[in-house]
Amino acid sequence: TVPTGKKSEVTFVLRGADKTYKQKVSVTPMRHWNVYLYNHAHVDIGYTNTHKNVEQLHKNNIIEGIKLAEETKDHPDGARFVWNPEVGWPMERLWQSNPEMQDELVEVMKKGRICLDASYLNLNTSICADEELFHVFKFTREMQRLSGVPSDVFQQFDIPGMSWGLIPVMAQEGVKYIISWPNTDRAGNAHKNMDGKPFWWVGPDGKSKVLFLQPGGYANSGSMGKGGETGRPWFGQRDPAKVPKVIRMGYANVDFTEKLTALEKENYPYDYTVLSWSLWDNNPLDADVPFAVKEWNEKYAYPKIIISGGHEIMSMIEEKYGDQLPVVSGDYTEYWTDGLGTAAGLTARNRNAKEKLVQAETIWSMLADGGKAPREDFDEAWRYILLGSEHTWCFENPTEPYFQDAIWKVKQSYFHEAEDRSIDMLDESLAPATDKSNGALGPKEGPANGGIAVFNTHSWPQSGVIRLTAKESLRGDKVLDSKGKELLSQRISTGELLVYVPDVPALESSHIRVVEGKCSLLGSCKIEGTTLKNDCLAVHVDRITGNIVSLLKNGSTYNYIGEGANTFSWLPGNVDEPKGDTVVSVAVGEEGPLAVELCVTSKATGCRRISRSVRLQAGQPWVEISNVVDKLPLVEKDGIHFGFAFNLPDSKTRVDIPWGVMEVEKDQWAQGNRNWLAMQRWLDVSNDTHGVTWCSLDVPLFEYGNRTA
């Protein structure tokens, strides 16, 4: 036996009948490696099978994981089986569907046989709303409370990148660690100079921090090789009875010496590595692993393999290396948010549902007079919103019609359910402010006969324009406030009545009443050709292109627009050959004292029709833009882009992200995405003298500088 504690010179001697051969060799000892093996099945909600079958498979993995942990309970340390559900969704679904198992689930968590990590789903975190991020941890916080076992690792699989704004939320929720396992496909620079290098990640508040580790891509153990050998009997199998409960093939290749030797050659500074063991996506667990690990550890002192959960891995790194690790700030800009562009309408529904839920919860606090909020109903609405933000969309094989249609149907339902629930919760929260219905038909003057309450759910005073439906404003076009003072109003082409309501106090309401007659007030809005004006701005739309070519503040000649704004272009996949639209008409949409609007109708490649409306409202220092694209269902990849070229040289672009503000480039990691970025509600482009704040209600994605995808 050659000693391995230090580098040694060893002489090999070979003696023959009449000759002796000697050779000196240098023996470098192998590091005393600990290999932490994280057993899981990657959780895609859909993608490889119907949602129902995927849910059943992951619930079964927990049940089988409990059995395998019991079977291997007498194995030596490191070889006892531990199952990691990866995210909270499989455990939560099992908790809800099998209440008789709840005590057992808590008990196996206490024993360390099931290790529950902190996130509910694998999410596009950068498109999550501020409040939404707290609901990511709701279920696992409850399980942590019941079990007393820390669920303090945010595991993110598949998705390259995650939002900087996650950090302060994690800190508040007691989640101390992140392990990121990004895919290697469509991942850009996500793996560049970062895999296997832990560091402290400081949040945008400059105070909160978590310990971050990116071991590499998931299944970096090579386990997908075995997954491929199985033929993936779980993939696209309609009958769940035909899916094996577990995978048993009598072997699992846990010889990682080649990987470890490569790390040593790269001067990797640590004595551990972290590997993911997953056979593929949504797969049955591999029951061979604990037996292969036991055999390996009994045969070799090192490398030692340790079947682990996330907390064990990260707490080891913190304890052993925490005070030696670098501190990093900035945004790990996500790559896979482009999927939202394939479902722009549904994405808009989810964004608006989030805002409604925030309003509903605020109004409940304002009106319930201390009454208990329907917390479970609110939480379930947020759960559907999270399912919309989850990273999977359709079937892995899009040419297979049954699964493609079945999976897409359920994915769409999450957005619709979230929208419906948000509307219901808003209606319920407003109930204390409503009058009793006056008979089956109601008053002939409409439901607003008793007046209208206008609520401000912001923590600052607010003025603005509200819309009353035709039924809510049957009595007339004139509106009075609670003191009888007339308010500026305008009946528009949709039949709705616009009303300017000034100075609603923070977290309070104002009362208005629709009365007979016409509005007698004069507003500041007017149209001159294709120029819209109010008392703050003048915006000019080019009659030929339909683009905004001029934006001036009143009293100034400075044009905030560069080459044009709200410009349409269609881009074929992977070819930088954009095509513009052809304007069919530019027409007046609205013209009155409170609002003026121009509507541009055009045709373009890849679309049946495009409409772009530009609107100003009296007293408001902003331009409202509404674009509607009637897109053709093309099979080949393509994209729709609206460009905004501002005349703001040497400017900086700052973006509203969850719980923070990110400056483009300055605050982005080198590993982050540059092709498209996500924002919450606004971005700001400013230099030392001028600036534009650009808000988007429906669309979270933007490109910076030029079309980049």
Question: Model features per residue range: what roles?
Answer:
Residues T1-G451, G476, S482-K485, S489, ...:
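Catalytic-domain carbohydrate-binding cleft regions of carbohydrate-active enzymes
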Residues G16, D481-S482, N534, K553:
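Structural motif
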Residues F455-R475, D638-N647:
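Surface-exposed beta-strand/loop patches in extracellular or lumenal glycoproteins
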Residues D424-L468, L521-N534:
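Surface beta-strand/loop "capping" patches
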Residues T457-P461, R513-E563, V628-D630:
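Beta-strand-rich N-terminal accessory domains
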Residues H540-C599, V692:
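An extended acidic
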Residues T50, G216, I466, G517, ...:
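Residue-level detector of alpha-helical segments with a strong bias toward transmembrane helices
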Residues L468, K478-E486, N566-W570:
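Acidic, glycine-rich two-metal-ion catalytic cores of nucleic acid-processing enzymes
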